[in-house]
UniProtKB/Swiss-Prot annotation:
It comes from the Eukaryota. The keyword Mitochondrion does not apply. It comes from Papio hamadryas (Hamadryas baboon). Gene3D superfamilies: Medium-chain alcohol dehydrogenases, catalytic domain, NAD(P)-binding Rossmann-like Domain. Its cofactor is Zn(2+). Keywords: Acetylation, Cytoplasm, Lipid metabolism, Metal-binding, NAD, Oxidoreductase, Phosphoprotein, Zinc. This is All-trans-retinol dehydrogenase [NAD(+)] ADH1B. The lineage of its organism: Eukaryota, Metazoa, Chordata, Craniata, Vertebrata. Expressed in liver. GO terms for biological process: retinoic acid metabolic process; retinoid metabolic process; retinol metabolic process. NAD(+) binds at G200, L201, G202, G203, V204, G205, D224, K229, V293, G294, V295, R370. Binds 2 Zn(2+) ions per subunit. Homodimer or heterodimer of closely related subunits. The modification Phosphoserine is found at S23. Zn(2+) 2 binds at C98, C101, C104, C112.
């Protein structure tokens, strides 16, 4: 029996308040409105950004259904939708590509004005919500809300992908892999023979290591306080791994000594102000580029000496690895299908969706790189 045009009742993980576990609830998911798509989720990755909301470091309206790194199958479409149809395999996009705004029309940048990242409303683009639980409307998260068996997204925030794609793997391209890999190849534009440093060896950081290797970096120095992640980093391309806790001097000084004055490219993939500064300071003062990849804590600021930039450093950042989402994500999936890279090393745990809290515990304890939840 077709569910198109009807309210769907299903299971979802609702975050009712910060610093509390997710609650598996029965929710109602309304049909898609015009230019919207309802998706049956198949697999979803657990990303540190979701945990930033749980901890309160990233403010987003609650109660909400979080989740943004996922893959699924189109269940139904709203009026006017032309780019996907029921049955298509898709990846929801936490940064849309409307194709009409100044950013989308420019060859540079990908931060479409339709995003719900800067000042999150917790709604779809028309300002309304599609989830109800216990008689209450539930907020969306960055326009995706993939911790649910069904979700509704705007058409400009969904990417159709190869019909043969293994969704339990390519879901990582929905955030972690694309963000890290793209930070190296698109944002920093790592050059052959260069020296790179990557701070943070979670799923995004390791993807940045993979991007540096793909771009031809000669040295890739991986930095983390969890030595258990070093073997995986070397497997994926790191040439050296260092633990800041092994040194008495600041890690940026260690890196400068190791690299004749500083690295060519550095990446902060943690989301801490102190490591953002260390990442900036470790790149060469005359020609280094430092990229902010990790999501910073809410309402916190960095203060720097402008001389650090006047000498020639470049300090930049980007979401989604600089990919224009609707164009870039399907191409990455195609590259994966062509075996240009593997995602297997990033997926350390696969759990049923109902064990979402266990998956977050693995993340917080440093025991996992990426946990994929299956529906």
């Amino acid at each position: 029996m077709s569910t198109a045009g009807k309210v769907i009742k299903c299971k979802a993980a609702v975050l009712w308040e910060v610093k509390k576990p997710f609650s598996i609830e029965d929710v109602e998911v309304a049909p898609p409105k015009a230019y919207e798509v309802r998706i049956k989720m198949v697999a979803v990755g657990i990303c540190r950004t979701d945990d930033h909301v749980v901890s309160g470091n990233l403010v987003s309206p609650l109660p909400a259904i979080l989740g943004h790194e996922a893959a699924g199958i189109v269940e139904s479409v709203g009026e006017g939708v032309t780019t996907v149809k029921p049955g298509d395999k898709v990846i929801p996009l936490f940064t849309p590509q409307c194709g009409k705004c100044r950013v989308c029309k420019s060859p540079e940048g990908n931060y479409c004005v339709k995003n719900d990242l800067s000042n999150p409303r917790g709604t779809l683009q028309d300002g309304t919500r599609r989830f109800t639980c216990r008689g209450k409307p539930i907020h969306h998260f960055v326009g995706t809300s993939t911790f649910s068996q069904y979700t509704v997204v705007d058409e400009n925030a969904v990417a159709k992908i190869d019909a043969a794609s293994p969704l339990e793997k390519v879901c990582l391209i929905g955030c972690g892999f694309s963000t890290g890999y793209g930070s190296a190849v698109n944002v920093a534009k790592v050059t052959p023979g260069s020296v790179c440093a990557v701070f943070g060896l979670g799923g995004v950081g390791l993807s940045a290591v993979m991007g540096c290797k793909a771009a031809g970096a000669a040295r890739i120095i991986a930095v983390d306080i969890n030595k258990d992640k070093f073997a995986k980093a070397k497997e994926l391309g790191a040439t050296e791994c260092i633990n800041p806790q092994d040194y008495k001097k600041p890690i940026q000084e260690v890196l400068k000594e190791m690299t004749d004055g500083g690295v060519d490219f550095s990446f902060e993939v943690i989301g801490r102000l102190d490591t953002m500064m260390a990442s900036l300071l470790c790149c060469h003062e005359a020609c280094g580029t430092s990229v902010i990849v990790g999501v910073p804590p809410d309402s916190q600021n960095l203060s720097i000496n402008p001389m650090l930039l006047l000498t020639g450093r470049t300090w930049k950042g980007a979401v989604y690895g600089g990919f224009k989402s609707r164009e870039g994500i399907p191409k990455l999936v195609a590259d994966f299908m062509a075996k240009k890279f593997s995602l297997d090393a990033l997926i350390t745990h696969v759990l049923p969706f109902e064990k979402i809290n266990e998956g977050f515990d693995l993340l917080r304890s440093g025991k996992s790189i990426r946990t994929v939840l299956t529906f």
